[in-house]
Amino acid sequence: MAEEKFSNFLTDIIDADLAEGKVDVVHTRFPPEPNGYLHIGSAKAIFINYTIAKHYGGLFNLRFDDTNPAREGDEYVQSILQDLNWLGADPNGGIYYGSDYFERCYEYAEQLIREGKAYVDDLTREQMQEYRGNDAGKPSRPSPYRDRTPEENLDLFRRMRAGEFADGEKTLRAKIDLASPNMNMRDPTIYRIKHVTHHRQGDKWCIYPMYDFAHPIQDAIEGITFSLCSLEFENHRPLYDWVIRNLFGKEFPKQREFARLNVTNTVMSKRYLRELVEKHIVDGWDDPRMPTLSGLRRRGYTPTSIFTFVKEAGISKADNLVDMRQLEAVLRAELELNAQRRVAVLDPIKLIIDNYPADRCEMFDLPNNPNREVNDTSTRPVAFTKELWIERSDFFEVPPPKFKRLTLGSEVRLMGAYLVRCTGVDKDEAGNVVAVHANADLETRNGNPADGRKVRGTIHWVSCEHCIDAEVSLYDKLFTESNMNSIPDDADFKDYLNPDSVTTVPHAKLEESLKDAKPGDRFQFVRNGYFTPDSKHAGTYNRIVTLKDSFKV
């Protein structure tokens, strides 16, 4: 990915700290939890942290936040590594795992206990919520166990580690400020018991640090200077600062927040996405309708289009909802320049050229990319024979008003080949047209009639003899509701699924040159849109985006 230079409120903060000599190296990180696949919203966090580090000649870490073993696994680790590699976001500061710091986190927890800044609590989760009060005016009250001595707390905490207690029987809480208006500062839990096998540590641990405790410690150990995260962590910043100040006695790392990327007609919640996968509503985490990076990759999106979209969506502290069509517009502009042109007939009907010899096959040179900005003059040979496939929608026996393509007695151009005039049709017993007949003007090999007559319509075609069969998937938005964050709290998000989010075209006919196409190749199917071979199902093509859209950036 090319270096990006930009200015926003985050770079303003960094510029000020650099100018005052508070930091020497800008060091950022991206800390995904390996319990699901990354999505388009994750791309914003990657873009910000990676690009800011690159902009300042600094370091960018990838750290797997695997401190909660319940749903984490190596499948997700590998998918995240693949996504960052695909995006070109090289973690030049290193790849780390939060679980590698478990021993250090434990030692820091004991330090807080010895200093009287943490205690073991026996309250249940429900009791703890009751004792903490709320931010609507209900005051908190201290746990009956808040004044245990450091010696008693150390003994209990070590027994927690030894596995003496059941899940939820005890927690370790930071002793901060029960009167704080910020609920996160009212003696937050920093360790809990979970007798769950960890995907990397096995059964070595049965107590695990909470994110709000582990995260600042990990940042400090790695030398992170700016912990840039999404806006939902803003109220957690005082706790982040408390941990850094009490354990490391310094100002940095510094946490700052930005607004999440919300996109129309989809969901970003891992819980919702996992439900779609586990209930087989979609074809896995990489279903081309999903907002996951693996789904977008399988659909045919490019890393450049995703980072360009994120940049154009803006970096601010104000939440906004970005139209998915903006991403499509960015990609469409890229593919218009870069995608090779090919011919595909999605809904075929046979066109028989009656005056063309049955044993004849001509090769016509069609342009690979006629876009003038590209200056690509290369061509490819396409076979022309007596029997061709054309789009069913390009012929009407009784045409609608202003129809300019093939009808009985009318003449059209066969793209890059001859002019043909329709002479008749074949029908089945039900009266359906099954084949169209025409005569070619064999003097118009270049499409230009000698008498200068005007022919307004041009249609595409492939040879029946020289083509390949394919299944084509035409994708639309996954949900009918534009803003899925606005649905009622008691609503089932699945009720908003779009029943027409995918249409399967089973018997498309593609030009023969596509037999060597590979997943990751992208083509413009002339007049039909942009397509790519599916990475899971051989012989299937996915529509990436349509040729045009009314959306304006």
Positions of PLM-derived features:
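Long, charged, mostly alpha-helical binding arms that flank functional sites
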Residues: 253-330
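Active-site cores that bind ATP or allylic diphosphates and position pyrophosphate for catalysis
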Residues: 66-68, 74, 111-273, 331, ...
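Core subunits and conserved enzymes of cellular information-processing
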Residues: 233-237, 241-243, 311-314, 321-553
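Secondary-structure transition/capping motifs at alpha-helix termini
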Residues: 19-22, 51-59, 85-92, 220, ...
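A glycine-rich helix N-cap at a beta->alpha junction
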Residues: 76-103, 108-109, 116-119
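N-terminal catalytic cores of NTP/NDP-binding nucleotidyl/phosphoryl-transfer enzymes
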Residues: 6-15, 19-82, 197-230
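Conserved short loop/turn motifs at secondary-structure junctions
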Residues: 31-35, 63-71, 94-103, 126, ...
